[in-house]
Each structure stands twice: as structure tokens, then as C-alpha cells.
Amino acid sequence: MTGILAGLLAAYMGLVGALYVAQRHLMYHPGGPSLSPTAAGVPEMRTIELKTRDGLLVSSWYAPPKSGQPTLVYFHGNAGAIVDRAEKARPYLHHGYGVLLAGYRGYGGNPGSPSEQGLYADGEAVIEFLKTQGILPAAQIMYGESLGTGI
């Protein structure tokens, strides 16, 4: 009986250890090719490079707002990348909204590996960019999908 319990405990500890080692791969599912906004069907947008506080350059897509319109900041979900959310930007662009599709480290051809702190840094870089464009917080609409709700 003691041998069976010891075996079960060893198996359990092995499983816990394997999950600990693999947790990042289980948590983040980066993907999506690195395409241009035009190739993705949103020629109104342009690729911007955002420098994060840890020095990484992360690509995002941006279209400025028409006069008096707010800017939608879209933080995408776990699977895929900004290229997979291009169709979600089209209606807002059509109505003159500014749109920023936020890219993340390790997603869509961006350098780095995703992590909680890294994604926060990516989000902070987005906010800093909006400041440089003169877009006040009152004119920003933050939208998060899945993983993006935490950024």
C-alpha cells in the first residue's frame, strides 16, 4: 500500500512539475502572420513601431480619427494577432473613428515572448503613443477581447 501511495505521489509531483515548466506555452497562444494593413484589408491603417519600457519594438496598426471622433484601442485575445482582427476595425474606420490595433510581443511576428509583465509594458507603450498623438483619455475607447481585457 505504501508503494502505491509513493508511486501516486511521485506521478502527481511529476505532473505538477511538467505543468510548471510548460505554463507559458499553455497560457499564451501567439500566432498570426506579419502582414501589412493593406494586405489585411485595412489600407487606411499604417504600421507603427512602439518602444516598450524594456526596449522592445512592438508593431501595431493605427489610423488617426477624423475631426471630433474618438479612438478605439483594441487589445486582441490570446489566439492570433492583429491581422486576425482587421475586419473588426473596418466599421469604426468607416465612421471616422481612430483605431489602434495593439500588437503584443511574440504575436504576429513581433519580437520577444509573451508574459504578464511584458504585455503590461506593451499596453503602456500604446497609451504613451496616444499621448504623442494628442489623443486625450476622454477620447479613447479601450476594448479588450479575452486576454486583451487584462492589458
Task: Mark where each language-model region is.
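Sparse recognition of residues in long alpha-helices and their boundaries
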Residues: 43, 139-142
